[in-house]
Amino acid sequence: MQNSESIIKNIKNSSYLIDKEFLVWPENAFIGDKNIELIEKWNLKSYIKERKNFFSDDSVKKEYEEIHKKFNEEAISSYHVIISNLEEIYENCKRNKKIYYQDIMPTVKKVIEFYKKQKKIFIKYFRIPKLSANYHIIHSVNTAILTVALGNEMGLNNYKTVELCSIALLHKIGFLFIPSKISEKKEALTEEELEIIKKYPIISYKIASTSNLSRSICLTLLTHKENLDGTGYPKGLTSENISIESNIIGAASAYSAIILDKAYKKSFNSGASIIELIKDADKKFDKRVLKLIINAISSCPLDFIVELNDNSIAKIVDIDESNPNLPYINYIIKNGKVIDKNEQSSVQSIPNTNTGIKKILNQNEIELIKNKYSLIDII
């Protein structure tokens, strides 16, 4: 049996073809009236159409017991079962150097069922305790759930949704054969180590292509790290040679990475993660795909921190199903003073009043507020 170093060394960058397909997407993505300017530079303004939904969240970063009070016990169990199932799939692949479609189908089904049941709050489960699962496993599960959400926004048929979910679950499979001293390194990678990391899509492709996975799955595993401007890897392809499926997986993976805690990097909250994602959108991601992510994320309750019309800082905590454009907020800073958690009570945000939302805060703005008011965290 070949060891990891041998597998990497023997990889050859052979030529391959990329299939391209048209994408039909709904013209109703929504970020918020005061936040649209953040993505004007990517020429997305003409695509944004207001719809009746908003962002909310009940809790984030609570102690484990508190989280279980807020989150659905059955959903938490289902989420952890998906993680455990994918761990088993990855372990089998590491032993056998192969992966079979029928082996991942039960997990794909569970991911799709999880999304359908938690459609309005699925992002919240990305931030619950993950036990001791491997980062790449958790990242792949979260990417798969988000990919199913994107498929829902696109109105994809079941076959295509299953295919994209399968790719998302497997898109980090190549990391199994990257030496852990490199793949789990907390410090900055050397140039040589970075080049080894960049081979993981090729490893994934080689494993998939020697199994019974479809050509479309194999090629998307190979190219999901390619960027529109040619700065991606492993081949440095440009937009005309990158399939829409690859860009969907790449963008979903990027968002899932931003929102997920790492040993060496603190995660962003859900709202700040969107802003972080769109920073390099013109270089990396298809505008249509970015629009789908904005649409999917803004459709479910989130932990957005916002600035109000009176310059107060608040967190969106609930949504009125009968009037989704009027979310409920808890003040964090009001009249220049920190509001004690025990004194917080939810009020409804009304446009064109003091409680109206001016903008969503990015991570830098959140950090500035934390430092200014000596807050350990904003939750």
Curated annotation (Swiss-Prot):
Swiss-Prot/TrEMBL catalytic activity: 3',3'-c-di-GMP + 2 H2O = 2 GMP + 2 H(+)
Enzyme class (EC, first level): hydrolase
Phenotype caused by lack of the gene: Mutant cells exhibit a significantly increased flex rate. Deletion does not significantly affect virulence in needle-inoculated mice, but mutants display a reduced ability to survive in ticks and they are unable to complete the mouse-tick-mouse infection cycle.
Protein name per the record: Cyclic di-GMP phosphodiesterase PdeB
Key words of the record: c-di-GMP, Hydrolase
Keyword Disulfide bond recorded: no
UniProt cofactor(s): Mn(2+)
One GO MF term attached to the UniProt entry: hydrolase activity
Lineage of the organism: Bacteria, Pseudomonadati, Spirochaetota, Spirochaetia, Spirochaetales
E.C. code: 3.1.4.-
Pfam families per record: HD_5
Sequence ranges assigned to domain HD-GYP in this UniProt record: 114-310
Function: Phosphodiesterase (PDE) that catalyzes the hydrolysis of cyclic diguanylate (c-di-GMP) to GMP.
